[in-house]
Amino acid sequence: RKPAGFCGIVGFKPTWGRISRFGVIPYASSLDHVGAFTRNVRDMAIVTEALAGRDDRDMTSSNRPVPHYLKDLNSDIKGIKIAVLKTVSDEIRNEDIKNNFAHVVNTFKQLGAIVEEVEIPNHLARAILPTYTIIADSEATSNHSCLDGIKYGDRQPGNSTDEVMINSRTD
C-alpha cells in the first residue's frame, strides 16, 4: 500500500488467502498476500473480485464466497467500527498526509461509522518490526534455500561452496 500511496494510485492488501498465491514465487509464505495496483478504487474492486476465490492449486486459498466488491462499493457504512491506531497516527510528521488522514477519518464519521482511537502499548509497537523481520527472513531463507545451485539445478564443480554456487549460477 505504501508504494501505491507514494505513486498516487490505489493498493489493496486483501485478507490472507482471499486471492490464490499459486504461481507466485514466495518470499515469506505465512505473510505473503497477492494484491494489485490500480488507478482508482472502482478498478480495484473489479480486479479483486476477478482474482478472489478458491483455487485448488493453493491449499491456503479461502473457501468463503467472494463478495460483490463493485456492488458493495457505495454501501452504507453507518454503524461499522473503524479503529485508528493512535500509536501510528501520532507519528505522522508530514502535514499534508496528517491533514488528509484527518479528512478521511472525519468523512468516515460523517458517513456514520464508529471511529475509535486504539493505542498499542509502545513496547508492543516496537516489537512489530523485529518480529516481522525474524519471521520473514526465516521463511525467505527456507523458501529460497533450494536456489543455491547445489541441491537442485545444473550443479557445476568448484573447489569451495562459494565457487560451486558461482559456477552453477553463471553457467
Each model region followed by its residue ranges:
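FAD-binding core of FAD-dependent oxidoreductases
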Residues: R1-G8
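Conserved catalytic core of Hanks-type protein kinase domains
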Residues: A50, I134-I135
